[in-house]
């Protein structure tokens, strides 16, 4: 009988060992497979992130898409493309306006004329708009000016989008009197805000004049009623080559050769000459000056190909325009076109070489020669992905790929001198409230902030963790330890990303609903622990005997 029992025990033990080995092998292969899959998943995540991030560092490209001619007359004063990249427009120095297709379909061909208009009057001057603006002003021989803009009406007949171009006069059909003496306007500049517009001009007899129109809403009709006032610009240079006006109507720039005069027009009753600067590069002459998007910086093009950026810097309690950085082009700057909503710009030399730059990144993104000679006009679309240029009678379209010009290694890891800052700095500001400011992408503050936060977290976490581990190992009872130890190990095994995800989605709303209590917890919890220890110390031995040795930690749970 004993022999039979022994045989049965051996058989049961062998069967149990066989099952155990099978389970061990399954567990071994399962853990190995799971670990390998985790590594594969991490590698896939890494390569996917690399695939997503890589285009940020791609360079700019431009590819020709179309070429056409238009029945135009006069010199091109302003060339542009509407927001949908479907219609282009050209304003001449004689007031002729042409609308044409820049995208073709079965009904419309690229370059097909979609409409024409004419600004009436004896035109003697024209003021193209600043980057991102759509208002253009024409000056007349009688000292008046007319402000017009291209308008694109969008309709959906039969569920098909149709864009109809036209010419509008947003401030009324009647011209504005810029010079009360009625002299011809030979050079002018124009800018407007929501409730004010200003026109500065040079008259035929060399005077500097300015007209400012203020708008007020009629509370009965709801229409905007405009009233104009005229002012004089003192100390105007004898030979004015160019004028610029900031969109906030605070600063007027007047260029005479290589010299730039800066006028403070914030107080129109006391227009004053604030500064006179020599802005040319060494051994070069200025060919063109433009405002960068946001109108906080000046771009100065020279005949040696150098383009310099200037903006105001606070020095000795005063704000002075300072040369910040230079860009080297390929030849004498003939065209200088800022982008609409970014700190980039495009230049073209007399040989037809087109170059893309980004001002803050201090980078030259692309340089490509366009066959056909010098460009007479150059425009970039509001989406920055279509380039329109004119060479003689020919108009050319290019598809531009330039998604992230602001992202460079220097912008990420080096000090950058941003507009409005007194010196180069490490700055992180991913978004901004308006186009006047730009994203600041330095990773240095993020890295140091992360390291600093980790250090201060470890200052508190390391002593608490080590002390908790010592207490759990040497003082806590075995019955309580078997619950605490696995719980802590599971928490340690959870990725911090998961913990952050739970904290953001689940814990944050709970804390928000009890925020005063959570803040008081930081004060009351240490006090409660000390008070509990004090009370426990003064309890008699008979009162302490109800709690077994090593279970004292549960007294803190109610707290």
Show the residue positions of the predicted features:
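Periplasmic/extracellular loop-to-transmembrane helix junction in inner-membrane transport proteins
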Residues: 14, 18-25, 56-95, 99-133, ...
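Hydrophobic alpha-helical transmembrane signal-anchor segments
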Residues: 22-53
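Structural signature of WD-repeat beta-propellers
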Residues: 41, 90-94, 138-142, 201-205, ...
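Hydrophobic beta-strand positions that form the internal "hydrophobic ladder"
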Residues: 88, 136, 197-199, 252, ...
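Structural motif
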Residues: 94-100, 142-149, 157, 205-214, ...
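Transmembrane alpha-helix signature in integral membrane proteins
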Residues: 443-471, 516-523
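Transmembrane-helix boundary motif in ABC transporter permease subunits
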Residues: 457-488, 532-538
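Generic hydrophobic transmembrane alpha-helix motif, especially the helices
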Residues: 491-559
């Amino acid at each position: 009988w004993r022999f039979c029992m022994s045989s049965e025990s051996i058989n049961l033990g062998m069967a149990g060992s066989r099952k155990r080995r099978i389970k061990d092998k399954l567990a071994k292969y399962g853990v190995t497979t799971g670990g390998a899959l985790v590594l594969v998943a991490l590698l896939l995540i890494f390569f996917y992130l690399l695939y997503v991030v890589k285009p940020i560092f791609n360079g700019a490209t431009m590819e020709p898409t179309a070429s056409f001619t238009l029945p135009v007359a006069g010199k091109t004063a302003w060339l542009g493309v509407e927001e949908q990249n479907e219609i282009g427009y050209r304003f001449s120095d004689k007031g002729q306006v042409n609308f044409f297709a820049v995208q073709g379909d079965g009904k419309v061909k690229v370059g097909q004329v979609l409409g024409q208009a004419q600004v009436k009057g004896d035109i003697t001057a024209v003021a193209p708009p600043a980057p991102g603006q759509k208002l253009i002003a024409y000056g007349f021989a009688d000292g008046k000016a007319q402000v017009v803009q291209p308008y694109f009406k969008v309709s959906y007949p039969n569920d098909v989008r149709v864009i109809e171009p036209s010419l509008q006069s947003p401030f009324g059909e009647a011209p504005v009197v810029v010079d009360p003496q009625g002299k011809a306007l030979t050079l002018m500049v124009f800018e407007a805000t929501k409730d004010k517009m200003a026109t500065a001009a040079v008259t035929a007899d060399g005077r500097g004049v300015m007209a400012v129109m203020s708008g007020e809403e009629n509370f009965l009709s709801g229409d905007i009623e405009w009233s104009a006032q005229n002012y004089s610009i003192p100390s105007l240079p004898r030979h004015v080559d160019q004028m610029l006006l900031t969109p906030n109507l605070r600063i007027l720039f007047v260029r005479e050769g290589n010299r730039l005069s800066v006028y403070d027009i914030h107080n129109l009753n006391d227009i004053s000459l604030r500064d006179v600067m020599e802005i040319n590069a060494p051994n070069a002459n200025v060919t063109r000056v433009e405002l960068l998007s946001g109108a906080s910086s000046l771009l100065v093009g020279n005949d040696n190909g150098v383009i310099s950026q200037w903006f105001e810097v606070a020095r000795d309690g005063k704000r002075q325009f300072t040369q910040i950085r230079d860009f080297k082009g390929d030849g004498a700057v003939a065209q200088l076109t800022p982008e609409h909503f970014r700190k980039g710009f495009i230049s073209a030399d007399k040989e037809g070489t087109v170059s893309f730059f980004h001002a803050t990144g201090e980078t030259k993104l692309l340089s490509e020669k366009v066959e056909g000679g010098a460009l007479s006009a150059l425009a970039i679309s509001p989406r920055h992905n279509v380039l329109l240029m004119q060479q003689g009678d020919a108009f050319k379209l290019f598809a531009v790929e330039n998604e992230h010009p602001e992202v460079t290694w220097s912008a990420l890891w080096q000090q950058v001198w941003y507009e409005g800052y007194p010196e180069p700095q490490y700055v992180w500001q991913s978004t901004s409230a308006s186009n006047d400011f730009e994203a600041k992408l330095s990773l240095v503050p993020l890295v140091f902030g992360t390291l600093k936060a980790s250090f201060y977290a470890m200052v508190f976490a390391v002593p608490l963790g080590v002390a908790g581990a010592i207490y759990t190992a040497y003082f806590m009872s075995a019955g309580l330890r078997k619950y605490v130890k696995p719980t802590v190990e599971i928490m340690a095994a959870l990725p911090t990303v998961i913990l952050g995800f739970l904290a953001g989605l689940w814990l944050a709303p709970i804390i928000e609903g009890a925020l005063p209590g959570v803040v008081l917890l930081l004060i009351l919890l240490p006090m409660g622990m000390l008070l509990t220890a004090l009370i426990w110390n003064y309890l008699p031995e008979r009162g302490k005997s109800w709690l077994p040795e090593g279970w004292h930690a549960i007294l803190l749970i109610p707290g």
